Amino acid sequence: MTTESRLTFYHSPNTRSTAALILLEELGAPFELKVLDMKAGEQRQPAYLVINPMGKVPALVHDGALITEQPAVFIYLADLFPDAGLAPPIGDPLRGPYLRWMVFYGSCFEPAVIDRSMQREPAAMSTSPYGDYDMMLSPLTEQLAKGPY
């Protein structure tokens, strides 16, 4: 990242944006932190909806470009700070599996864990993005068993 680049990070405590905030801090990234009070509804105010029309966090703005969705922010930051060694570079054969597991988090793992923790039945197998909890956990467990990581 060049010294002229500018990162602005929109965060609310006790939300999924906390992981992205920790990543920014661990990377030593220069960024401006904007904290939203979601209990007061700041994420639904016109000033923030101009930034992120969905009114969600995390939101990262880099030189005017908006990045939302936690896995996208993680991937973007890993690519923006390649010296940290968090992601295989484009062209590396490991890039595909890396992207698979980064996207798996938001599209399969998190929805399955939330449904399980809230004691909700998953959607029908034909419409569920992850099948059911055990179906989601099986490939993850198999991958982690290969270790080390």
What are these language model-derived features?
Residues 71-82:
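A basic- and aromatic-enriched beta-loop-alpha substructure that forms the phosphate/nucleotide-
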Residues 72, 97-100, 135, 139:
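Alpha-helical elements of Rossmann-like donor-binding domains used by nucleotide-donor carbohydrate transfer enzymes
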Residues 105-149:
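GST-like fold's C-terminal all-alpha helical module
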